[in-house]
């Protein structure tokens, strides 16, 4: 029941943040924005999200998680509505930044709440089921914002998603329950310092930063890339840039949850092994997405990347919770999100700048090297710090 309720919150968490990317061409035409300015609109969310992450995590280890989840949902939904009222570039940047502030409190609190209900034997499956809402929300945000934007103007999607989010928040006030904490954090103790007792935490966070850099490029620029390179309509580019990749990610995340739970019963680094497989196998599909001139090959590439991205995504937080103490779980997620979205926050602007010199196709394909690098780092870290030792005969 808990995972089902949080699934819908996470759905709007991603639908609201994704919607703006599908209407970049409309914003560019109406407000006369450059690609760099559009990149900053996308990055403003991530910069604030990253800055607030550690604070949100520490608050999540000390304050009622239900309050943070429901309060955050209502706040960012209202900001989504306000985004529709923007009439200039500065207002867009401001509201995107405020949305990043509100959404930053969700994942630390929700992941801590799920871990309180699920032991290590079922944690990957529970979190992978929750993670599927990320892809559903991304598809919905990208697709419906594009369709509504094409027919009713770019503002319409923000009114719809924001209004529905507020209604969901009011429902959750009555039905969402706060679970007991496993361990009460000591007041005055530095949770952030305690996180890094296990060096594998730093490895997981570094890998997440690189993987998130690549993911943010796809989320931010793929709709515009399809609109310009393949001459798709606004609604079709919004759909195609999310649906193939994200549906495949749902399959990947469900596979990754089951596989990781099985491997983790035998090996200390079982979840990390699953993530490494996803990272390595995703490399050629990233390259193909940027390089191909064929729409069928493009669809195959996006779906292939999405599936193997799902293997990695299924265990982002489950792997982290394997190597941190229960009283530090929300803080760990906050710090991981913070550093990961610093990487993600650079991506929209960096790719806009690179595309101006090398072209968007080459810039997207080059990110296959980033994925390869973090895949190698994951393998080396797992072998060194987790040992690959059998823990269950």
Describe these PLM feature segments:
Residues 67-81, 271-286:
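Structural signature of the two symmetry-related core transmembrane helices
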Residues 95-136:
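Cytoplasmic helix-loop-helix junction between adjacent transmembrane helices
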